[in-house]
Amino acid sequence: MFIQHGFSTIISAEKIGRNCWINQQVTIGFSNDTESPLIGDNVTIYAGAKVIGKVRIGNNSIVGANAVVVKDVPANSTVVGIPACIVRRDGERVKELL
């Protein structure tokens, strides 16, 4: 795991997989004491993104800058926006709500 500029970055995850890249001002947090995110392998989370609650970020996925993720992200996907939506899945452009 690589955390770029760890200041203002909050991480409270159930698990973070291998080879993850987390940029500055990211929040990975829980919605209560038992609901923490689970981050898969080879995940990149860009600056300012928020991953909140008992959600899973699938392997090989990207969370775009300032995205707000409150639902599961499938493997091999890119999500952006508030609330986050899928814009790429398995290498193909899509537009899907989470």
PLM regions with names:
Residues 1-87, 92:
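Structural signal for interior beta-strand "rungs" in well-ordered beta-sheet cores
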Residues 81, 97-98:
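C-terminal membrane module of polytopic membrane proteins
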